[in-house]
């Protein structure tokens, strides 16, 4: 029996990159998965096709034969966040695992950052996570079940990142949200943890990948000497979503090749 067989997982922002990798790994471990996207339906459908290729059975005769389902939602809108949770439950009948992966960043010197950009980052990276988690926990309480919450943070919950101050603040907030909820939700049998990736080879880093000088400088800061892959993050998420991690909560796990302890600002 696979570790996540019979479980249903929602992964926000999962049409590409790290989120896509997480969806595929959870499906490989037997979970049915909800693939969320904001503005990339083609990526969501491509992810769904890969999930369907993995195979597997639904846990009820009423649900589709595939293991996957796509839902559009903007995580910067609380109304859409709540509807995303509701639609996921309506489709599969329940939710067991929530992976808060969706995130955005805005580049600007601190003294030039606009209120609109600040709000955009905070709404997705922190506010959206807060209310998605709240709706998920309400579902677990109503159905008298336990569950797993995994937040995708960043090494920048600890590392300064000049010109991305709002992003760093959002990830620092996510760290404390996780710690606080581990205490508040522990008695309910609900665990919550952060996974903090470093430099991962994804579409969001295309500009970096095409700049040999900057890429070389970054690699010199990574003791393992390479960029991470989505599967590096996904494997840890799958572990934290399983019963093998039943006694782990309130922690941040860095997936960064050692970058955090060897970082020198370029």
What is the role of each PLM region?
Residues 8, 15-17:
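Conserved glycine-rich cofactor-binding loop
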Residues 133, 170, 178:
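Active-site helix of classical SDR
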Residues 159, 238, 249-266:
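Short C-terminal tail/terminal secondary-structure segment
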Residues 138, 183-187, 246:
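Alpha-helical segment proximal to the catalytic Tyr-Lys
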Residues 109-110, 114-122, 218:
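Substrate-binding pocket helix/loop in short-chain dehydrogenase/reductase
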Residues 111, 159-165, 187-188, 225, ...:
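Active-site loop immediately N-terminal to the catalytic Tyr-X3-Lys motif
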Residues 154:
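Residue(s) in the substrate-gating loop at a strand-loop-helix junction
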């Amino acid at each position: 029996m696979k570790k996540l067989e019979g479980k249903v997982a929602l992964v926000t922002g999962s049409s590409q990159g790290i989120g896509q990798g997480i969806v595929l790994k959870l499906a490989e471990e037997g979970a049915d998965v909800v693939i969320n996207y904001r503005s990339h339906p083609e990526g969501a459908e491509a992810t769904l096709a890969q999930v369907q290729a993995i195979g597997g059975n639904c846990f009820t005769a009423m649900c589709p034969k595939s293991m996957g389902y796509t839902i559009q939602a903007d995580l910067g809108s609380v109304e859409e966040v709540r509807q995303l949770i509701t639609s996921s439950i309506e489709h599969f009948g329940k939710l067991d695992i929530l992976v808060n992966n969706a995130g955005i960043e805005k580049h600007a010197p601190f003294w030039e950052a606009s209120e609109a950009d600040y709000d955009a980052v905070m709404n997705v990276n922190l506010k959206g996570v807060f209310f998605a988690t709240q709706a998920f926990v309400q579902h677990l309480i109503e159905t008298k079940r336990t569950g797993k919450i995994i937040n995708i943070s960043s090494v920048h919950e600890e590392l300064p990142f000049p010109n991305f101050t709002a992003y760093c603040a959002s990830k620092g907030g996510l760290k404390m949200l996780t710690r606080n909820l581990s205490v508040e939700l522990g008695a309910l049998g609900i665990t919550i943890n952060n996974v903090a990736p470093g430099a991962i080879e994804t579409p969001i880093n295309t500009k970096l990948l095409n700049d040999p000088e900057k890429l070389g400088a970054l690699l010199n800061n990574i003791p393992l000497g390479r960029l991470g892959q989505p599967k590096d993050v996904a494997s840890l998420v799958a572990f934290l979503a399983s019963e093998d991690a039943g006694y782990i909560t309130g922690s941040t796990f860095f997936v960064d090749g050692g970058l955090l302890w060897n970082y020198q600002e370029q």
